């Protein structure tokens, strides 16, 4: 009887252990499944978060691209100032990663992001209090700050020194440049109409317009046409020749201005190349090639004349 009792107890103990073992195994399996589901859910949420962030980043960049495209080649109007400011504010709000995503018909990260020098070194010469005599320097313009201050600004300063009794002011013919500089650097440069209106409002009597254009091309023609609309607003209006002077009757005619420019740039090229003279460069087998922007305008004949020179 005692042996049967011991055997029965042993059987019960083993059965209990087996049941307990099965229960532990089932619990572990359930816990593992729950953990896997949690990890999978977290991965899905993380992926969705990344994708959502990427969409948000691109949307922010696309918005800035739209604002840049709106002002890029825009003719100045009543909304230009506000739109330039809005585009810059939106750009400044982007992260560095978002800025790299900016892309539009004309827009890219360089529109606001490219370093072209210190804009504060450039004087837009758009002040009032002009007086009766104004010398208006008209250039196509450049959005490169250092070049604008040194090259265009250098010409303007030289004219100020040469004609102290005249007020020197600036105008650009390229609205695309004006908009870019204003949006990026908050520097406002007059276009030709703005500059002429400023002259009228300030009571200018004698106006001399000095273009920095190279030749009698489309920009020069448009400048002259614009001036015709204001000729009765001043007592005298004088328009200076572009750097290469008047257009001759044919490609063999080389006027004095073209000859001087040809000699000047050749001398500078020889000096930059380290030669004492053009003959020395020739003896050394060195040739100089001068490249121009080119134009479909009839003024392209100037290039042929230089070749004759």
Residue map of PLM features:
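Hydrophobic core
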Residues: 10-18
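Bacterial lipoprotein signal-peptidase II cleavage site
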Residues: 20-32
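Post-signal peptide N-terminal segment of mature Sec-exported envelope proteins
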Residues: 30-56
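Extended amphipathic ligand-handling, pore-lining, and cofactor/metal-binding catalytic surfaces
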Residues: 108-309
């Amino acid at each position: 009887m005692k042996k049967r009792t011991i055997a029965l107890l042993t059987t019960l103990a083993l059965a209990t252990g087996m049941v307990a073992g099965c229960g532990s195994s089932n619990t572990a399996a359930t816990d593992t499944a729950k953990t896997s589901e949690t990890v999978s859910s977290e991965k899905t949420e993380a992926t969705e978060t990344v994708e959502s962030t990427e969409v948000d980043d691109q949307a922010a960049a696309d918005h800035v691209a739209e604002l840049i495209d709106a002002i890029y080649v825009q003719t100045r109007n009543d909304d230009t100032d506000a739109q330039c400011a809005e585009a810059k504010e939106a750009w400044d709000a982007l992260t560095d990663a978002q800025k790299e995503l900016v892309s539009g018909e004309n827009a890219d990260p360089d529109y606001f992001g490219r370093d072209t020098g210190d804009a504060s070194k450039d004087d837009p010469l758009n002040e009032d209090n002009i007086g009766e005599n104004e010398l208006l320097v008209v250039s196509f313009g450049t959005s490169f700050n250092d070049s604008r201050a040194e090259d265009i600004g250098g010409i303007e300063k030289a004219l100020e020194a040469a004609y102290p009794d005249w007020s020197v002011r600036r105008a650009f013919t390229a609205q695309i440049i004006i908009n870019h500089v204003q949006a990026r650097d908050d520097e406002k440069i007059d276009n030709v109409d703005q500059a002429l209106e400023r002259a009228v409002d300030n009571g200018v009597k004698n106006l001399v317009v000095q273009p920095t254009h190279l030749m009698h091309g489309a920009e020069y023609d448009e400048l002259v046409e614009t001036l015709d609309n204001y000729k009765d607003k001043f007592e005298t209006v004088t328009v200076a020749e572009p750097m290469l002077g008047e257009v001759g009757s044919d490609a063999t005619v080389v006027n004095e201005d073209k000859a001087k420019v040809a000699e000047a740039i050749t001398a500078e090229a020889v000096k930059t190349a380290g030669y004492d003279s053009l003959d020395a460069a020739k003896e050394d087998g060195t040739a100089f090639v001068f490249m121009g922007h080119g134009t479909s305008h009839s003024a392209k004949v100037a290039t042929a004349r230089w070749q004759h020179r």
